UniProtKB/Swiss-Prot annotation:
GO terms for biological process: proteasome-mediated ubiquitin-dependent protein catabolic process; protein ubiquitination. A zinc finger (B box-type) spans 163-212, 224-266. Residues 533-702 form the B30.2/SPRY domain. Zn(2+) 2 binds at C229, H232, C252, H258. This is E3 ubiquitin-protein ligase TRIM9. The coiled coil domain mediates the interaction with the N-terminal t-SNARE domain of SNAP25. Residues 374-432 form the COS domain. Zn(2+) 1 binds at C168, C171, C193, H198. Brain. Highly expressed in the cerebral cortex (at protein level). Severely decreased in the affected brain areas in Parkinson disease and dementia with Lewy bodies. The gene is TRIM9.
């Protein structure tokens, strides 16, 4: 019953209703509280005064509207309009519910009479503090409102069940504890109110005062007062007016405004309304049960939210820590590359210092020797050696020619860390708000007519289905490893076309694509099978070649402008399969030593191929050849090259070896074993040599047969 307590309290005083009356809006008020919130309209602001003054529309025109509609709402004399607006010259105050309250015309009489029986000022109205609807009172004042005897009985039973102390019914502010009850007045008094309102003299001297507990018992045992008609106070209700929805007496039916209305027996309507209320309560009870279950669900959600929050925070911290760890690992890798570049630069500079020191010492020795020879006075002896000395001086001078006195390495580090994409990604790092109402994109469609392969590159194109209405934020393209292995992402972005380079030759790849948005990812498209070229077609790469290299014939023919060896690489790199290419010698003067083989992308370009650890090569003159890697010369083999000779290079990455051929004959044994990684075809030569590259060649038959036998 504790939840019912708010229903039993007056909205004005906040205490249990005392002598509650029913307003036309069906809300209840204490009689004393209703008296306190009466609003008196001054004569100067009455509608008649405004009309007499000839003024225009005012705030009190609402009163006219209500008086014109006194009988429009079931003859109740009840109208709806807003609160009054105060005039500058009229003293007033605002109550919390926005009702305008004027000072009473005279102080309330300090008598023993109930406040409801005191005279009501003229032009009074009352505003319901709950729905704020207003009513102009007639001559009966508050006596025109029926008393809610049922509510009184409910309050009595509730207070008895709570065994609460009885309160005085006449205290104007916070009611004090009652000390007596008058059986005749049926009112509980505290001592101050009893002395003020119920003095023991005159007619009141014959009243019997009893303790509050005894009075409560006698009140409960005494029959409840029967509700009387508000229009005929001496008559009890006997019938029920269906049109006005209120009990009426027989005089109302014979003489009053209900004479022409449909009426029914009071007992029958009492039972009918009780039945209707019970049925309505059943529905409300079901709703209350659902509300309790919903509250349990909400309380469980609070606990679940707490647990999910802790779990999500832990997951977020773990993800951020993983990003930090990955960044630290990448930092270590980049620092290792910087250190490697540092060591490489120092090695190159030190090697050049050593080389120049030796050559300078030789040059200085030759100069000193020539000066001493010039000092000799023996003409015949001088002429015997002068020609050779002159040639040596010119040759030495040529050796100090172009490029020799140029540093092979710059002091600057040609490395620039582009961290802007990562910073942008960090700034864009945010939570993805998944909306259940937003579906995932439709499955993309691969456009077969636009998909193709060239050499070891594949171009794929896709589109959204024509009738798709869900936009895609981007696409994810996946390829397997060419051996039927797991798929891996090769492109993520908004474009609908992508070219993938660096695939293996003579390999079969499977490709698929899916779309994504903030809600999730679509299913994969159908898998597309791609076949790369069986053999490689490529040319020399001018972008990575030394500046002294001269290319022609669509970058298939190469020579050099320097007497020193310079390196040029092919455009295509290999990391898998068997590959064969040839080079024909177009020009060969003064017996130089060109070198042929494979190299990494960062091989030294200003020395013979094989001088560093980034190249694997065979260098050859007109009589013999050598294999060279990391400046180590091995396997001298007889047989050289001349103009028109053909050099073949066979890179078998399946067996991880490199073999050379001259004029279709294998030159020496297998040159290098255990070669793996990414390799580019490479050549080093000087100005005395010109060669032409031939690609797209099948593996020699004899090698294929030997490989199949093995």
């Amino acid at each position: 019953m504790e939840e019912m307590e708010e229903e039993l309290k007056c909205p004005v005083c906040g205490s249990f209703y005392r002598e509650p009356i029913i307003l036309p809006c069906s809300h209840n008020l204490c009689q004393a509280c209703a008296r306190n919130i009466l609003v008196q309209t001054p004569e100067s602001e009455s509608p008649q005064s405004h009309r007499a003054a000839g003024s225009g529309v005012s705030d009190y025109d609402y009163l006219d509207l209500d008086k014109m509609s006194l009988y429009s709402e079931a003859d109740s004399g009840y109208g709806s309009y807003g609160g009054f607006a105060s005039a500058p010259t009229t003293p007033c105050q605002k109550s919390p519910n926005g009702v305008r309250v004027f000072p009473p015309a005279m102080p309330p009489p300090a008598t023993h009479l109930s406040p409801a029986l005191a005279p009501v000022p003229r032009n009074s109205c009352i505003t319901c503090p709950q729905c704020h609807r207003s009513l102009i009172l007639d001559d009966r004042g508050l006596r025109g409102f029926p008393k809610n005897r049922v509510l009184e009985g409910v309050i009595d039973r509730y207070q008895q069940s709570k065994a609460a102390a009885l309160k005085c019914q006449l205290c104007e502010k916070a009611p004090k504890e009652a000390t007596v009850m008058c059986e005749q007045c049926d009112v509980f008094y505290c001592d101050p109110c009893r002395l003020r309102c119920h003095p023991p003299r005159g007619p009141l001297a014959k009243h019997r005062l009893v303790p509050p507990a005894q009075g409560r018992v006698s009140r409960r045992l005494s029959p409840r007062k029967v509700s009387t008609c508000t229009d005929h106070e001496l008559e009890n209700h006997s019938m029920y007016c269906v049109q006005c929805k209120m009990p009426v007496c027989y005089q109302c039916l014979e003489e009053g405004k209900h004479s022409s209305h449909e009426v029914k027996a009071l007992g029958a309507m009492w039972k009918l309304h009780k039945s209707q209320l019970s049925q309505a309560l059943n529905g409300l009870s079901d709703r209350a049960k659902e509300a309790k279950e919903f509250l349990v669900q909400l309380r469980n959600m609070v606990q679940q939210i707490q647990e999910n929050s802790v779990e999500f925070e832990a997951c977020l911290v773990a993800q951020c820590d993983a990003l930090i760890d990955a960044l630290n690992r990448r930092k270590a890798q980049l620092l290792a590359r910087v250190n490697k570049e540092h060591e490489h630069k120092l090695k190159v500079v030190r090697d050049q210092i050593s080389h120049c020191t030796v050559k300078l010492r030789q040059t200085t020795g030759l100069m000193e020797y020539c000066l001493e020879v010039i000092k000799e006075n023996d003409p015949s002896g001088f002429l015997q050696i002068s020609d050779a000395l002159i040639r040596r001086v010119h040759l030495t001078e040529d050796q100090w020619g172009k490029g020799t006195l140029t540093p092979r390495m710059t002091t600057d580090f040609d490395l620039s860390l582009d961290n802007s994409p990562l910073l942008q990604s960090i700034h864009q790092l945010d939570f993805v708000q998944v909306k259940a109402s937003s579906p995932v994109p439709a499955t993309p469609i691969l456009q077969l007519e636009e998909c193709c392969t060239h050499n070891n590159s594949a171009t794929l194109s896709w589109k959204q289905p024509p009738l798709s209405t869900v936009p895609a934020d981007g696409y994810i393209l996946e390829l397997d490893d060419g051996n039927g292995g797991q798929f891996r992402e090769v492109y993520v972005g908004k474009e609908t076309m992508c070219t993938v380079d660096g695939l293996h030759f003579n390999s079969t790849y499977n490709a698929r694509v899916k779309a994504f948005n903030k809600t999730g990812v679509s299913p994969y498209s159908k898998t597309l099978v791609l076949q790369t070229s069986e053999v490689a077609w490529f040319a020399f790469d001018p972008g990575s070649a030394h500046s002294d290299i001269i290319l022609s014939n669509d970058n298939l023919t190469v020579t050099c402008s320097s007497y020193d060896d310079r390196v040029v690489l092919g455009k295509t790199g290999f990391s898998k399969g068997i590959h064969y290419w040839e080079l024909t010698v177009d020009r060969y003067d003064n017996h130089p030593d060109p070198a042929f083989g494979v190299a990494r992308m960062d091989v030294m370009k200003d020395v013979m191929l094989g001088k560093d650890d980034k190249a694997w090569a065979m260098y050859v003159d007109n009589n013999r050849s050598w294999f060279m890697h990391n400046n180590s010369h091995t396997n001298r083999t007889e047989g050289g090259i001349t103009k028109g000779a053909t050099i073949g290079v066979l890179l078998d990455l399946n067996r991880k070896n490199l073999t050379f051929f001259i004029n279709d004959e294998q030159q020496g044994p297998i040159a290098f074993d255990n070669v793996e990684g990414l390799f580019f075809p490479a050549v080093s030569l000087n100005r005395n040599v010109q060669v032409t590259l031939h690609t797209g060649l099948p593996v020699p038959d004899f090698y294929s047969s030997r490989a199949s036998i093995a």
